[in-house]
Structures are given as structure tokens and as C-alpha cells.
């Protein structure tokens, strides 16, 4: 049964409301705005019937303070008043009230207004749930598509298989610990998954060369940042996805590539991915070496603080490292 809170300083008006709708709804009757706010601190209702003209705290003030409460911020409100001033009605509706009913109440009109507002609120919640479900489905599909593209690219080199997925995982952990908002973290995850997409344009004989690269070959490898940014530049739905590909090899002291950006000039997503990328590279076996030990990896990360890596983000990453949150790769991975 739907719960309705009726607030009016007139006992007679509250009795009229009770007689009109009793049996259809669970009803709570209160005589002041103060009582209503105290009640909503610990209780939820489906609708508030709120008298406009009350002593001490009128309906307008009660409404404003009600919207500040967790249990009152979204509840529909119908204002009740004997006031014939049209401006009052306009003001109430502009504030977000669901309806405005004048006294004396017509029982059938009152019941229909209440029914209509509750049905509309129920429909609104239903549509919100559907939108959330569809959004979650789209986000899941987006992640799976991006992860598949990433895996296809890394299939060219068994030594980097799963690299982008792990970089995304570490980046998300860092951003969560840093207090980033949910949508920003989701964007970062997608950006990290595609940060190395530019390697699709690097020849296999350079990408998978077991020995030391020549100066010319290293220049070709470095071009993956530009190639990746060019591939991703038309994606507008994920902010900074181009920046993640272009700038993840920049260094905090300005000696990185491709643009030699320094400190805050480097987008935050790229600074985070840069740390996660370097960690995974050290934590993974390569064609020319085994994975490094935890002690060596930590030492290398610390040595890069303020030169290669953003000090703030690195400190957070080291916390995760020391807590054992960053998994060691198995040889079979």
C-alpha cells in the first residue's frame, strides 16, 4: 500500500483528507513542517500533501528543507491551500511540486489528483530503471567490443597478450583510490584498453624484434602514439581517448614523447596510464628478458618519481603495490 504524508496545521483539514482517502493508502497525519521534516529523517513515503499557509514554518520553507533530506529529495509533493493567488501556484510548480490543490477539497477531484501523481511517479521510476538497464547493457557491450579489439591487436605478440586489459585494470584501481567519479573511471578504463592501438601500424619485424632497436626502428615504435591518436580522434563519446593514446609515453619532467609535455600539461588519464603501462612492462616476460622481481619493480617506480611519473599518482600506485593489490603475472599468462 502506498504511503502518504499529509501536513497541515488544521486538524479539521487533516481529518477531511483522512476521510477522503482512508482505506486506499497508508496515511500519516502531521501538524507542522517541523514534524514532517523530523518524520522524514527516518521514514520514507510515496507522496506528501503539504499545506502552503502554516505558522512558524510555511509550506514553501518546508518544501525547500524537505528536498535537502535523503528521504525527501525525490518524493512527489502536492501543495494544498485556500490561497486564490495564482502567483503562489506558479511559484510552487516552478519549485518542482507535482500538483497544486485548492481548498475546499472536492473528494473525487482530490482522489484523482493523488492517483495521477502516484501513477506518474511510478512511471517515472520505471523509465529510470529501464534507462539504467539499457545504459548498463550499452556500457558492457562497449567494454567487450573495446577489449576484443585490444586482444586482436595484441595477438600479434604473445609476450604482450593481455597487456592493455591489465593496464586498464591497474589504471582503474589507481583512479578509484584517487577518488575519481564513476563515469571518469569508466572512461579511463576504455581509454587504457586502447592506449596502444597505434601499434597496429608498426611492422611486425620492428614490433617483435628480439634484439636492441636501431635509432630508426625506435622512431618507428614511438610513432604508435601518433598513429593511435589519429585512429581514435573521431571518437567523441569518450573524452580524452585520443589523449590517452597520444600522451601515455610523456614523462613528468618533459623528456618523453611525442610532444615533450611536462607535469600538468600531460592529461591525467595519460599520467595514470603511463604508470600502469610501465608497471605491467616490468611485471611481464619479454622476448629479450624475464619479468622483473617485485623488489626491482618497486625500486624502478620510486626512481621514476617526479622524472618519469607523476608523484601524486605514483604514491597512490605504490600504496596499492605495497598492499599486494597489484597481481604478479604467472608465466602461463
Residue map of PLM features:
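Two-component/phosphorelay signaling modules centered on CheY-like receiver
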Residues: 2, 11-29
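Receiver (REC) domain active-site loop signature in two-component systems and cognate sites
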Residues: 54, 62, 66, 92
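Active-site beta3 strand of CheY-like receiver
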Residues: 43-50
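C-terminal output helix
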Residues: 101-114
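Metal-dependent catalytic cores of enzymes that make or break cyclic nucleotides
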Residues: 147-333
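Helix N-cap/capping motif at the beta->alpha junctions
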Residues: 29-38, 59-61
Amino acid at each position: 500500500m502506498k504511503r502518504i504524508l499529509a501536513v497541515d496545521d488544521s486538524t479539521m483539514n487533516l481529518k477531511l483528507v483522512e476521510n477522503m482517502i482512508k482505506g486506499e493508502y497508508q496515511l500519516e497525519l502531521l501538524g507542522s513542517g517541523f514534524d514532517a521534516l523530523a518524520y522524514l529523517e527516518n521514514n520514507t513515503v510515496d507522496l506528501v500533501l503539504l499545506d502552503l499557509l502554516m505558522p512558524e514554518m510555511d509550506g514553501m520553507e518546508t518544501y525547500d528543507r524537505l528536498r535537502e533530506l535523503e528521504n525527501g529529495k525525490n518524493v512527489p509533493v502536492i501543495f494544498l491551500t485556500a490561497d486564490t493567488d495564482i502567483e503562489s501556484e506558479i511559484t510552487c510548480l516552478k519549485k518542482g511540486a507535482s500538483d497544486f490543490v485548492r481548498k475546499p477539497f472536492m473528494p473525487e477531484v482530490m482522489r484523482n489528483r493523488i492517483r495521477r501523481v502516484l501513477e506518474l511517479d511510478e512511471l517515472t521510476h520505471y523509465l529510470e530503471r529501464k534507462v539504467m538497464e539499457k545504459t548498463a547493457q550499452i556500457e558492457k557491450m562497449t567494454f567487450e567490443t573495446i577489449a576484443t579489439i585490444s586482444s586482436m591487436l595484441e595477438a600479434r605478440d604473445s609476450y604482450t597478450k593481455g597487456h592493455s586489459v591489465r593496464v586498464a585494470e591497474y589504471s582503474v584501481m589507481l583512479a578509484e583510490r584517487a577518488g575519481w567519479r564513476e563515469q571518469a573511471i569508466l572512461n579511463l578504463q576504455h581509454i587504457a584498453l586502447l592506449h596502444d592501438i597505434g601499434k597496429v601500424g608498426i611492422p611486425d619485424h620492428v614490433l617483435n624484434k628480439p634484439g636492441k632497436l636501431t635509432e630508426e626502428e625506435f622512431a618507428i615504435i614511438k610513432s604508435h602514439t601518433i598513429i593511435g591518436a589519429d585512429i581514435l580522434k573521431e571518437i567523441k563519446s569518450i573524452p580524452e581517448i585520443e589523449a590517452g593514446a597520444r600522451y601515455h609515453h610523456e614523462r613528468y619532467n618533459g623528456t618523453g614523447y611525442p610532444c615533450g609535455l611536462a607535469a600538468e600539461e600531460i592529461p591525467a588519464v595519460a599520467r595514470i596510464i603511463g604508470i600502469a603501462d610501465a608497471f605491467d612492462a616490468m611485471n611481464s616476460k619479454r622476448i629479450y628478458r624475464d619479468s622483473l622481481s617485485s623488489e626491482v619493480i618497486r625500486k624502478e617506480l620510486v626512481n621514476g618519481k617526479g622524472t618519469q611519473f607523476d608523484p601524486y599518482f605514483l604514491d597512490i600506485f605504490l600504496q596499492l603495490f605495497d598492499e599486494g593489490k597489484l597481481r604478479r603475472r604467472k608465466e602461463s599468462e
